[in-house]
Amino acid sequence: NVTEPLTVNAQPTRATVEENYRQILQDLSDGAALLAKKKTKQSGYADYYTNIALQARVKLYMEDYDGALNAAREIIESGVYKLYEPADWTASWSKQFGSESIFELGITTEESHLGTSSLGFYLMRYGQLKNAMGWYLASDYFLNRLGEDETDVRWGIMDNDEYWVDNEIERKGACYKYMGS
């Protein structure tokens, strides 16, 4: 791992996977110490809990399940984040900085509206917005499983898909997540 400036002719050896993980965790640990002074949610920015969530993710990759669980528990037990109630879940998809969001980039329309550059634009049904791509169709398997419970909150984020447009047969296979701010 390169942690110091190199000369132009330097040829450092490749680090092992273990060495990389060790360096990543060291960097995160060093950062956590600096971020710990303000253990509050900083919407739109990486904060202390973002750091701890990344540590949990790295530990999962390392198969350090106890370490990952301990890091995740720190976030859960902090009380800073709250899971949505089913009644609030659908509306949460169209809002920034929800109560479950540990890290979310803050992007405003004044800075850079993600509308046609967002993942949601590619998932949206063709023609729902000007030039929407309509490249996403939920599988029949997924829709059948979803159909086993008509009260499943995920129906709240589904819309008619391309099959409906082409065949005029209602099929809720398009998703409106990530539509931009």
Where on the chain are the PLM-derived regions?
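Aromatic-lined, polymer-binding surfaces characteristic
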Residues: 45
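Aromatic-anchored glycine-rich loop motif in surface-exposed flexible loops
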Residues: 1-41
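Hydrophobic-face positions in mid-chain alpha helices that act as interaction patches
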Residues: 6-11, 25, 69-181
